[in-house]
Amino acid sequence: DGSVQLFRPDMNIARMKNTCERMCMPEVPGDLFMAGLKAVIEADKDWVPSGKNTSLYIRPFMFGDEVSFSVLPAKHYKFMIILSPTGSYYAANDAGLTTARIYVQDTYIRAARGGTGYAKVGGNYGGGMRASQDAMRYNCKDVLWLDAAEHKYVEEIGTSNAFFVIGDEVITAPLDSGTI
């Protein structure tokens, strides 16, 4: 019907809260987050794509805003939300299926228990750059990350959860492990 819908904003607000807690940043109140989200989408509604397999990518983020080189939590922060129209991450093949070659990474790690893997922080992306470049060399679209301890248990794909269907059962990495 042409209306703009938000997908699980409550879960995104909760993830931001968890990230802020982990990074010693002040929590963004849920009502402020939602009001900001609605305001920026309303202001930029002409950027919302309407084509098949398109969406508006929404990236909320926060950073310390002060002059300091210390490795301490900041006293002042800025919370921002940026938007970008986007298409399908993976292109459909001739049969109309969306598939992708995935590179299994067994050397580097993206996250370890006790780390920041569950939080939305830039370092998680930075740590994956080498593996992403390796994947591209093999004509792969993304990286399948294995566990940090033994490099044999599936954790996640860089851009999404990984799951397997065996019979009637859906198997995925534990969501409470602290790494995804």
Place the predicted regions along the sequence by residue.
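Helix-start/capping segments and mature chain N-termini
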Residues: 1-40, 68-180
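Secondary-structure boundary/capping residues
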Residues: 25, 46-50
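Short alpha-helical segments and helix-capping/turn motifs at coil-helix boundaries
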Residues: 42-44, 63-68
